[in-house]
Amino acid sequence: LNAPQATPTLPDAQTVIEVQHYTDRLFSFKVTRPRTLRFRSGEFVMIGLLKEDGKPLLRAYSIASPAWDDELEFYSIKVQDGPLTSKLQHIKKGDQIILRPKPVGTLVHDALLPGKRIWLFATGTGIAPFASILREPQTYEDYEQIILTHTCREKNELAYGENLIQEIQNGGLMSELVGEDSLKKLIYYPTTTRDPSNQMGRITDLLKSGKLLKDLGIEGISEQTDRAMVCGSLGLNTDLKKILEGFGLKEGANSEPAHYVVEKAFVG
């Protein structure tokens, strides 16, 4: 008798639990978490699919879920001719993806010196690591004020961030973890660059003009009080580095904590 053939499994396979599409260019998905995976909120892993030749095609993706979560969440762009995202955007519940359980990254609390206020500057899907950090209780223990800025071209591209903030502030699990008073530390500042909205403009321009600080009632940014994390396009990373260093902040790393950090692996 022939033994039934086993279903082939991918190396480092994880199962898709949920997929949510926001626009024709943006979607998020959740997968099972390997039992052995330990990570710090803000880190990224390599995920992907098998190519037709049987070799894995992997890209760096920030984990959007916090370190305490049983599931892993990711937030992605869809690039129609992109080697990976052209296929990844079609995944559905029950499918398998490859996930290499070796997390790394610079957007972690360990890379920053203690401060009073933390700025999380994101464009597009660069909000993903901050979705993890904003659901991490340590963030609320370490800082008196937590400011998330999220800039997208169109208003509907802000939906993921809007849902995230709503989930955090609705008095559910996060208020149990950190207390309702701590959640009042969180300020959300979304901006658009193309669609009309309440706040328009690039965050770099709003910082340089002083409008951002004025809107938030903040006198200034200094290395004594302020810490920052930056995740977005290459242009944003470069421009914000100059602006933050103009305020006297120095770039930090896991090995040498300082005042701000930039995720170099992410560009999108």
Question: Language-model features: where?
Answer:
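Short helix-loop-beta connector
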Residues: L112-R117, E223-Q224
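Histidine-anchored nucleotide/phosphate-binding helix
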Residues: P129-T139
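Reductase modules of NAD(P)H-dependent flavoproteins
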Residues: A6-D12, T149, N156-G268
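Ser/Thr-glycine-rich phosphate-binding loops at phosphate-binding pockets of nucleotides
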Residues: T123-A128
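Ferredoxin-reductase
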Residues: N2-D95
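A short, basic/flexible loop-to-alpha-helix module at the beginning of a structural domain
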Residues: P103-L113
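Conserved beta-strand elements of the Class I
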Residues: I118-F121, M229
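Conserved S-adenosyl-L-methionine
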Residues: G115, Y140-E144
